[in-house]
Regions:
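Catalytic or ion-translocation cores adjacent to nucleophile or general acid/base/metal-coordination motifs
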Residues: 244, 248-264, 273-334
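Structured alpha-helical segments in the cores of large, soluble enzyme domains
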Residues: 206-211, 236, 240, 244, ...
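Helical scaffold of the NTase/Pol beta-like nucleotidyltransferase catalytic core
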Residues: 193-195, 225-252
């Protein structure tokens, strides 16, 4: 049985181009060694179009049977990554192949690297497929909703083991270059099948990789080779454009550098990008503005729920200068009438979420104004999802959400399924503790629909989730899309 599964895995590796034909025996022997097995019997049957998930599961079941691993998702993931390592080209080979293809075209290089990152099972296609995705019309264009199901839930045993595991500071975090080839442990994922492309931006060494959870097409992460904290500054804008010049078909953005309005990792300087056009990028300019000293730069307020100033020019250096000016003014800007405070008790509140892209021969930079002030009414943040929407989304509004893609928690899958059932059967939503948090929301939207049935209930809920997410984005906007809000936005622009 083991020989057969190993044969299938090696066949998969040859079909996908991970392993050349001449390395077949070598790869079989590496896999035998992982299983502490001396014997191999070539199966009589031949295999093609091998299903990776199924083959890995056969090998994992065998490893459990042999007492090599515990039967839980955390240990299985650590072990199957070790198996995939036997099929992987070395980092130097991947880098050479990437830059060889790059000479032909940047897109050919990224196509190769993205396919490799999936074939290697670093991006687990069969898990990503489970994510629920849909689009919803909004006053700001078509926004994307996803319920992220590709991160496996840890089982209680593994959680307990992680608690008792001795603390390690190697690698310092999930974004450090030392992850490449790391075997992992119960509280840190295995990364032997992970490859990084070294790049230079702003004359400093950075790494380019894909996100294992691909929230959107070719979702990449670009990270500083040093473990250094996030900081939005002049150099940030230079780095964003250096990357976009290297890969003009990709956008690149940065999370803000303050808690609440930032991303989940503030400790390691990094950006996120990819090959995808978000609703925000499609959103038009609703009001053109001219900024003194930068009359040659196209600028305007974007029709978007968050407060975005878009600037465009053929010369990225002009955009870097203007963005730096906007950032410096915004960091120190207070407008009490609009409830914008640069700082309270010495704590700074204003920052920016920037996104860079190339459109034709123009460089474009979207500067999203952020503020992380908290009050007694809104202890998690004034410009953050308000409590009435926490049943759908209470996490930070980071870069990906800012651009118009909701990344919603896995719990919603089951909750929305239950909600459908309760709505169709006319049951009391508040009576079920799993979904009682949705009762007020349902009571609000149900009267809008005359006839809710089995055919349309799913679509109705998807649409209503989209409406809630749109409100969440409006909450995160410092200047609201109202005449008063736009007036206050213009006061800031005039201060430039």
């Amino acid at each position: 049985m083991l020989s057969k599964s190993i044969t299938k895995l090696v066949q998969y590796a040859m079909e996908t181009g991970l392993v050349p034909e001449c390395e077949k025996n070598y790869t079989i022997n590496l896999l035998l060694d992982v299983f502490h097995e001396d014997e191999y019997v070539e199966p009589e049957e031949s295999f093609s179009d091998v299903d990776l998930e199924e083959t890995l599961n056969e090998l994992l079941d065998e490893a459990v049977k042999r007492g090599l691993i515990e039967d839980s998702v955390v240990y299985r993931d650590l072990f199957d990554t070790r198996l995939m390592n036997c099929l992987m080209p070395r980092p130097a080979q991947v880098q050479k192949e990437f830059w060889d293809k790059y000479q032909n075209s940047p897109q050919e290089a990224t196509d190769y690297f993205y396919k490799l990152s999936q074939d290697s099972n670093y991006i687990r296609r069969y898990r990503v497929k489970k994510d629920q995705k849909w689009k919803v019309d909004s006053p700001y264009g078509e926004i994307d909703i996803t319920i992220n199901l590709s991160k496996p839930e840890k089982d209680p045993k593994a959680i307990a083991a992680a608690k008792n595991a001795k603390a390690s500071s190697y690698p310092k975090c999930l974004l450090c270059p030392e992850n490449e080839g790391y075997a992992g442990r119960v509280n840190h994922p295995a990364r032997q099948n992970h490859r990084i492309i070294p790049i230079t931006i702003n004359d400093t060494p950075w790494g380019f990789q894909y996100s294992p959870y691909v929230y959107y097409n070719e979702h990449c992460i670009v990270f500083n080779s040093k473990h250094t904290p996030m900081k939005i500054e002049r150099n940030t804008f230079i780095k964003l454009f250096d990357f976009v010049k290297l890969f003009p078909h990709y956008f690149l953005g940065s999370n803000a550098d303050l808690p609440i309005v930032g991303g989940s990792i503030l400790s390691h300087d990094h950006f996120q990008g990819g090959h995808y056009t978000f609703a925000m990028a499609k959103a038009p300019i609703e009001k053109h503005v001219t900024i003194p000293g930068f009359e040659d730069v196209e600028a305007g307020i974007v029709k978007w729920p968050l407060s975005v100033l878009r600037i465009r020019h053929k010369d990225s250096a002009r955009l870097v200068d203007l963005a730096t000016h906007v950032l410096e003014v915004w960091r120190g800007y207070t407008d009490e009438a609009a409830f914008v405070f640069a700082e309270t008790d010495g704590e700074p509140h204003n920052t920016i979420t920037p996104i860079a892209r190339k459109a034709g021969d123009m460089f474009e930079l979207d500067l999203t104004l952020r503020n992380n002030i908290t009050t007694e009414e809104n202890p998690l943040g004034v410009y953050h999802p308000h409590a009435e929407y926490h049943h759908i989304k209470k996490e930070n509004i980071g870069l990906i959400e800012v651009m118009g893609l909701a990344v919603l928690p896995a719990r919603l899958k089951e909750e929305l399924e239950l909600l459908e059932e309760y709505i169709l059967e006319g049951k009391d939503i508040a009576s079920n503790e799993k979904i009682e948090k949705h009762a007020a929301w349902a009571a609000e939207f149900l009267p809008k629909y005359k006839d809710i049935n089995k055919e349309n209930v799913h679509e109705i809920l998807q649409k209503e989730v989209g409406i809630v997410f749109t409100h969440v984005l409006e909450d995160a906007g410092v200047y609201k899309c109202t005449p008063e809000g736009r007036e206050a936005f213009m006061r800031f622009i005039e201060s430039l």
